Amino acid sequence: MTLAEANVGEEYIVRDIDADGDEELIDFLFSLGCYSGEPITVVSRKKSGCVVSIKDGRYNIDNDLAAAILV
């Protein structure tokens, strides 16, 4: 399942990043603390994306980015 399909308020574990070899995207997510084995929670959803909680931070990510995060 992708983060775009995840339920709001539930904690998930990141299984993988499906970035199709896009190292810039992988590096960006890694800088947020989003990598395999880390917990992630969808805090809320908007039409353009969602707000996620990773470690001690909250981040607004778009739908394409959420679809690349496998949980």
Place the predicted regions along the sequence by residue:
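A generic structural motif
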Residues: 7, 18, 44-46
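C-terminal structural segments of small proteins and small subunits
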Residues: 43-71
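Short, structured beta-strand/loop micro-motifs enriched in basic residues and often containing a Trp
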Residues: 11-25
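Short, conserved secondary-structure segments in the cores of folded domains
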Residues: 2, 28-31
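Extended, low-hydrophobicity, polar/charged segments
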Residues: 4-5, 24, 71
